[in-house]
C-alpha cells in the first residue's frame, strides 16, 4: 500500500475547463459468465465505479449511505454489452447508466456532481535513476507507467495526456535534471504553454530498490499543489492520480441535474 502526503499552497487561481468527458456514466468490470444473474450481481459494483467518476470526490461518497441506491442500480441501466478485454481476453460487462436520473438522485442526497467538462491535464512524468533521467513523451503512451496513469485517470473521469517530447521540448528541457520543482519559473512551464492545458503536472519518480517515491506538483494558473506517493510503482502512480482527481473535484464540483 502506498503512502500519500499532501500539502496545499494556494497562490491564485481561476476556473477553466477544456475537455468534455463523454463516458462518465459508463464503466465495466470482469465477469465469469454472460447470464442474467451475473449481470445483476455486478451492476451495483459498476454503478459504484460510475458514482466515483460523477461525484469526483471519494470522501464525499464515503459519508453517505449508498445502500438504497446500489440496491436499485439495475433501474438506472440504459445499455449493457458483453466484451472481451483487449489485453487478457477475459469477459467483461460494460454498463451505461441514465445520467439525468443519477444526477437527480445524487442532488436529492446532497451530493455535488462534478461537471462533465473538466480541466485537461498535461503530465510531465520524469524518471530519475542515479545520474540518468527520462521524461515520457507521446511515443511512450504504450509504456506500463503511462497505462497505469491513463487507467487511473479514466476511472476518475480525468482527461490527461503526455507531452510530445519532440526536439522543441527536448531543447527547452535540457537543464531540468537539477530543477525538478514546479513554480512560475520552472523550466517545465514554458514548454507547457504550447499544449494549452488547464493543469500542468510534474511527477518526479525516484526508484528505491523495489519501490518508488513520486513527488507530484501541479500548477493551474498560479495555484500550486505538492504531495508525495510511495510504494510499488503502479500503486504509487494510481494513488497520485486519485489524489489529483479528489483535489480537482473538490474545487470544481457543481450541482448538475440537467
Language-model features: locations:
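N-terminal Sec/ER secretory leader and immediately downstream segment
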Residues: 25-82, 87-91
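A short, hydrophobic beta-strand-centered structural micro-motif
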Residues: 75-83, 123, 180-213
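N-terminal segment of the mature soluble domain
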Residues: 43-65, 119, 123-131, 135-181
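Signal peptide-directed extracytoplasmic domains
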Residues: 64-124, 139
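Amphipathic beta-strand/beta-sheet edge segments enriched in Tyr/Trp
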Residues: 22-30, 99, 191-242
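Sec-dependent signal peptide recognition
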Residues: 2-8
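N-terminal signal peptide c-region/cleavage motif recognized by signal peptidases
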Residues: 13-16
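C-terminal/domain-edge helix-coil "capping" segments
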Residues: 41-56, 94-97, 106-116, 153-161, ...
Amino acid at each position: 500500500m502506498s503512502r500519500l502526503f499532501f500539502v496545499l499552497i494556494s497562490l491564485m487561481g481561476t476556473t477553466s475547463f477544456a475537455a468534455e468527458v463523454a463516458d462518465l456514466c459508463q464503466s465495466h468490470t470482469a465477469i465469469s459468465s454472460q447470464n442474467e444473474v451475473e449481470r445483476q450481481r455486478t451492476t451495483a459494483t459498476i454503478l459504484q465505479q460510475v458514482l466515483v467518476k460523477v461525484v469526483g470526490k471519494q470522501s464525499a461518497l464515503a459519508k453517505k449511505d449508498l445502500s438504497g441506491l446500489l440496491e436499485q442500480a439495475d433501474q438506472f441501466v440504459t445499455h449493457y454489452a458483453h466484451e472481451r478485454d483487449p489485453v487478457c481476453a477475459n469477459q467483461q460487462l460494460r454498463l451505461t447508466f441514465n445520467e439525468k436520473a443519477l444526477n437527480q438522485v445524487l442532488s436529492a442526497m446532497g451530493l455535488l456532481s462534478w461537471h462533465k467538462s473538466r480541466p485537461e491535464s498535461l503530465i510531465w512524468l520524469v524518471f530519475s535513476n542515479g545520474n540518468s533521467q527520462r521524461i515520457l513523451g507521446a511515443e511512450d503512451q504504450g509504456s506500463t507507467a503511462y497505462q497505469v496513469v491513463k487507467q487511473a485517470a479514466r476511472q476518475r473521469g480525468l482527461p490527461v495526456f503526455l507531452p510530445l517530447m519532440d526536439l522543441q521540448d527536448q531543447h527547452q528541457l535540457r537543464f531540468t535534471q537539477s530543477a525538478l520543482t514546479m513554480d512560475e519559473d520552472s523550466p517545465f512551464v514554458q514548454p507547457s504553454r504550447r499544449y494549452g492545458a488547464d493543469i500542468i503536472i510534474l511527477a518526479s519518480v525516484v526508484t528505491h530498490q523495489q519501490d518508488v517515491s513520486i513527488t507530484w506538483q501541479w500548477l493551474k494558473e498560479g495555484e500550486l499543489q505538492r504531495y508525495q506517493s510511495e510504494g510499488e510503482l503502479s500503486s504509487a502512480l494510481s494513488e497520485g492520480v486519485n489524489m489529483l482527481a479528489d483535489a480537482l473535484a473538490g474545487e470544481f464540483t457543481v450541482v448538475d441535474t440537467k
